[in-house]
Amino acid sequence: MNYNPKRTRFRKQHRGRMKGISYRGNTICFGKYALQALEPAWITSRQIEAGRRAMTRNARRGGKIWVRIFPDKPVTVRPAETRMGSGKGSPEYWVAVVKPGRILYEMGGVTENIARRAISIAASKMPIRAQFIISG
């Protein structure tokens, strides 16, 4: 899966700041088990995909996985050994802005110990601390 928007209104964005906690996307909606972020961070599309792959490999054919975050923020990088000035760099990769409390992945249709194992492996792929939660 290639996670990036099909088209955006603008090619480049400001960095912004990650203040406070997540008020949207912080409840379990689809599955029974979930991975919840405990720290603010930018999570790249590659990290999201690595976590998803780890979960699917661990759950094998049972269960369903939902990815609740989408990388819609372009991160620009300047070429190496370039002098200051001459505009902003070109978009290099995409990130999802994640605040504490945000649900990253959800899982359903499997037993709790399988879900716990799969989600803990996905959590180790993330650049932040995250916790396993159960709905209800």
Swiss-Prot record:
Annotated keywords: Chloroplast, Plastid, Ribonucleoprotein, Ribosomal protein
Gene3D superfamilies in the record: Ribosomal protein L10e/L16
Molecular-function GO term, any one: structural constituent of ribosome
Superkingdom assignment: Eukaryota
Description of how the protein assembles with itself and partners: Part of the 50S ribosomal subunit.
Family designation: Belongs to the universal ribosomal protein uL16 family.
The protein's name: Large ribosomal subunit protein uL16c
UniProt gene name: rpl16
